[in-house]
Amino acid sequence: MRQAGDTVFVNKDDGQCDVAVIWSVLWQGRMAKYRSIWETYRNKNKPVIVVEVGGIKRNETWKIGINGVNREADFANDMVDGERWKKFNVELEPWKQTGNNIIICGQHTNSHQWRNNPPMSKWFDQKITELRKYTDKPIIIRPHPRNHVAIDTTKYKDVKMVGPRRDKNTYDDTDLADRLKSAWAVVSHSSNPAMTAVFSGIPVYVSEASLTYEVGNKTFENINNPEMPDRQHWANKLAYTEWWTDEIEQGLPWKRIKKRLADNYLT
């Protein structure tokens, strides 16, 4: 940013800058302090750039967007081509249903993404109840690895909770890829597991806040015959939501974001 001629203050902001930059919108642990920055700037209708862990190449690439995360963010990715997607070397596996399980993925309730949703246990109950109107397929409840939730699965038929098995060599990578091998579909509000499922060819059911909304299903009415749309244009746009560290150091995402800020947010 400084190389681009911008003035940058690190941890010295008093709310008077044009733009704030924070890490994540999960108001938990060391990140909880960023909530006041978020609220100060958004209440003044000032933009906030949010940096967070990527979902295409987790722990290798990083999402950078304006005023939120996932589909709530502005990534300045309206005009794209297919070249950047190739850099990720991620195969869009053919749509398929490798198993019979419907996996409902939870999220961290301290995240700004969850602000308009009920407690996680109630959300799980709502999704199970709605699914049971249309299917008797087995349902697996999969909580967020760092967000404990209790739910009585015995009141439902063929529903069980299976927590993520965390990779001890990483912060919160899990066994999701293995779990998808038995999946018919994945249900998620807006978390990264839906993205992994789409890459793996597993249909998803998501909210408008999810980055997979464009290629996801919107209603459980078709759970026995999910839509499986073309994903290439979606992937091409997705490629401009995440960046490698060296690209960030070169100012590549900042160049796009800065122009969008000037055009749409700073007057």
Regions found by a protein language model. Name each.
Residues M1, R30-S36, P118-E130:
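Well-ordered, non-membrane alpha-helical segments in soluble/globular domains
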Residues M1-F9, D125-I128, H148-A150:
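Short, charged N-terminal beta->alpha structural module
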Residues M1-K87:
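Secretory-pathway glycan-assembly enzymes, especially type II membrane glycosyltransferases
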Residues W23-V25, V51-G55, G99-S111, P143-P145, ...:
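Short loop/turn segments at strand-loop or loop-helix junctions that form parts
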Residues T61-G99, E214-T267:
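Leloir-type glycosyltransferase catalytic cores
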Residues T109-P119:
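Surface-exposed cleft-lining segments at the edges of enzyme active sites
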Residues I128-T170:
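Catalytic donor nucleotide-activated moiety binding site of glycosyltransferases and closely related
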Residues Y171-K218:
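A donor-sugar binding/catalytic signature common to diverse glycosyltransferases
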